[in-house]
Amino acid sequence: MTKTVYVLNGPNLNLLGTREPQVYGSQTLADVEQLCTAACARHGLALVFRQSNHEGALVDWIHEAGRLHAAGQLAGVVLNAAAYTHTSVALLDAVKGTGVPVVELHISNVHARESFRHHSYLAGAARAVMCGFGVQGYALAIDGLAQW
């Protein structure tokens, strides 16, 4: 049975490649999806790759991943909640409520940026937190999930 990795991207990540390239790099979200597709293929994993600017959509997708997790069909979730990392109790509750293994991911090193970005509601519920590796962090997170 092939397990699935969900890669969920939060607000403004649809602007990758044009938004603050000095912080986030020049690769687009489509480039990130290709990177994730290749990483999953290396491990024989299926990929669900999504982005939304809406918190409720991210919650719904975590619930969807939770159903796969309950059926033993989920390798894990790579969650780049973007700004919702610092504000969303709803995402925290979704992760806790479903028990999905989550890697919290940030393209930039959030700890080297503004102080409001230093706090994560999700970190305590995540299996791992990765930041500062650029978009390559997505592939590294998938590599980690494949080992669990």
From Swiss-Prot:
Gene3D superfamilies in the record: Dehydroquinase, class II
UniProt enzyme class: lyase
Binding, substrate: N80, H86, D93, I107, S108, R117
Residues flagged as site, Transition state stabilizer: R19
Keywords, sorted A to Z: Amino-acid biosynthesis, Aromatic amino acid biosynthesis, Lyase
EC number(s) on file: 4.2.1.10
TM spans (from-to): none
Biological process according to GO: amino acid biosynthetic process; aromatic amino acid family biosynthetic process; chorismate biosynthetic process; quinate catabolic process
Reactions catalysed according to its record: 3-dehydroquinate = 3-dehydroshikimate + H2O
Pathway this chain belongs to: Metabolic intermediate biosynthesis; chorismate biosynthesis; chorismate from D-erythrose 4-phosphate and phosphoenolpyruvate: step 3/7
Origin superkingdom: Bacteria
Keyword Metal-binding: no
Gene Ontology molecular function terms on file: 3-dehydroquinate dehydratase activity
Keyword Lyase in record: yes
Catalytic residue positions: Y24 (proton acceptor), H106 (proton donor)
Pfam families tied to this protein: DHquinase_II
Entry-linked InterPro entries: DHquinase_II (IPR001874), DHquinase_II_CS (IPR018509), DHquinase_II_sf (IPR036441)
Subunit structure and binding partners: Homododecamer.
Family stated for the protein in its record: Belongs to the type-II 3-dehydroquinase family.
Function: Catalyzes a trans-dehydration via an enolate intermediate.
Protein name: 3-dehydroquinate dehydratase
The species this protein was found in: Acidovorax sp. (strain JS42)
Gene: aroQ
